[in-house]
């Protein structure tokens, strides 16, 4: 039934997916990146939901969340690519709506992967959720012109650093130390994505809003699209890999 609903949902989405494009210029690399990421997100969503049948019960929720992350992003990318191709404007509102839903889910994955293998306090999830929301809210305020770009950038980066601390040296790391080697390996890899993969976002913000006349919506969106590809899809694949390994050893 789950697979049937997934296929049905994909079929329903296809007309909208096909209609929101217009002509794509071969030299518009940002537009091409929108299309590539959209297709990759859909493929990843199908993959994660189908692969739920391969893992044990305690890992199914993690794969479900991975599928939700890529599925929600796919839906918003259908609209974002349309805005870009038709107007050439940065789809800031659509992008932040997407991030407001998917970034807390990505953060939730850290809690879920630890909860599946060891005991972890619920306070960790609350801290990470607050940190992610602060990062997103101030990022949006800076991009939307609600507040000055530099202060918003600094506050957002501080929230990101706070989350890294909690995961690298705080409650998250303490819980990870009691998990299996496979879970620890996955956790550490996810940490590197949070540190280096998420660093792509402030690079995009800086390029688009803090470089004066040198900034451009083209560079901003190309960088953001790359970041979403890495952080949403690769993140989920790491979860899938450890889930399959742990399930086969059970």
UniProtKB/Swiss-Prot annotation:
The record marks 106 as: Responsible for spectral tuning. Homopentamer. GPR protomers assemble into a pentamer around a central pore with a C5 symmetry axis. The chain crosses the membrane at residues 30-53, 59-87, 91-118, 122-144, 148-177, 181-208, 219-249. Gene3D superfamilies: Rhodopsin 7-helix transmembrane proteins. Changing residue 180 to A: Increased GPR photoactivity. Keywords: Cell membrane, Chromophore, Membrane, Photoreceptor protein, Receptor, Retinal protein, Sensory transduction, Signal, Transmembrane, Transmembrane helix, Transport. The modification N6-(retinylidene)lysine is found at residue 232. Light-driven proton pump. One of its GO terms (biological process) is phototransduction. The record marks 143 as: Proton release group. The record marks 98 as: Primary proton acceptor. It comes from Unknown prokaryotic organism. SUPFAM superfamilies: Family A G protein-coupled receptor-like. Belongs to the archaeal/bacterial/fungal opsin family. Pfam families: Bac_rhodopsin (PF01036). This is Green-light absorbing proteorhodopsin. Changing residue 59 to A: Reduced GPR photoactivity by about 50%. Residues 19-29, 88-90, 145-147, 209-218 are extracellular. Contains one covalently linked retinal chromophore per subunit. It is found in: Cell membrane. Changing residue 224 to F: Reduced GPR photoactivity by about 50%. The record marks 109 as: Primary proton donor. Residues 1-18 form the signal peptide. InterPro entries: Arc/bac/fun_rhodopsins, Proteorhodopsin, Rhodopsin_retinal_BS.
